[in-house]
């Protein structure tokens, strides 16, 4: 036989309610815990950003992204954000955004106008720029298989370094 408690004092109910609320709160936090969202700095002055990259003997990597793009988020999280933390100069241009930016000629334009000028229609797209704002490696367009994204990215970086 099971012993059923018969103590229904207010203190017992408060203790039980507190335990239930604590457990629900903790389980909700664990359930909805998400890794920190990886972000890249928005392009503001392409000539300055290019100069920093070339100083590091690297091409400037520009990621063209679109708000809500799952593949863009995966590329940032898995590859681009860690590279940026290790010193690679990477900036983001947001398709369909009117955020101001200086283009390679020093003219004020917008992120959306740059994506049109560069004829980018797929996100994510990675562009690799060298001296004079010229593309120095083949673009990476769209999503790649996760196991191959890193090697393809390293290959493009090697192409870009050779062109410097």
Predicted regions and their residues:
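Typically the conserved alpha-helix immediately C-terminal to a functionally engaged Cys/Sec
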Residues: 73-85
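Short active-site neighborhood of thiol/selenol oxidoreductases, capturing the structured segment around
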Residues: 56-67
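Non-catalytic, surface beta->alpha helical segment in thiol-disulfide oxidoreductase systems
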Residues: 128-161
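Thiol-based oxidoreductase modules, predominantly thioredoxin-like and allied folds used
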Residues: 87-108
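Solvent-exposed loop/turn segments at secondary-structure junctions
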Residues: 67-71, 96-100, 133-134, 146
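N-terminal "domain-start" segment that seeds a small globular fold
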Residues: 29-50
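N-terminal secretory signal peptides
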Residues: 1-13, 17, 22-28
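Structural micro-motif
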Residues: 112, 116-127
């Amino acid at each position: 036989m099971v012993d059923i408690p018969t103590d229904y004092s207010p203190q017992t109910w408060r203790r039980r309610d507190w335990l239930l609320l604590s457990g629900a709160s903790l389980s909700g936090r664990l359930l909805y815990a998400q890794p920190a969202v990886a972000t890249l700095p928005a392009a503001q002055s392409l000539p300055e950003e290019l100069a920093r990259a070339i100083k590091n003997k690297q091409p400037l990597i520009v990621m063209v992204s679109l708000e809500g793009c799952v593949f863009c988020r995966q590329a940032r999280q898995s590859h681009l954000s860690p590279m940026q933390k290790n010193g690679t100069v990477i900036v983001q241009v947001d398709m369909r955004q009117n955020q101001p930016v200086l283009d390679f000629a020093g003219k004020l334009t917008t992120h959306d106008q740059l994506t049109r000028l560069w004829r980018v229609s797929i996100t994510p797209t990675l562009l690799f720029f060298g001296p004079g704002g010229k593309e120095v490696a083949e673009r990476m367009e769209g999503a790649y298989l996760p196991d191959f994204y890193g090697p393809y990215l390293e290959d493009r970086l090697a192409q870009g370094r050779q062109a410097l």
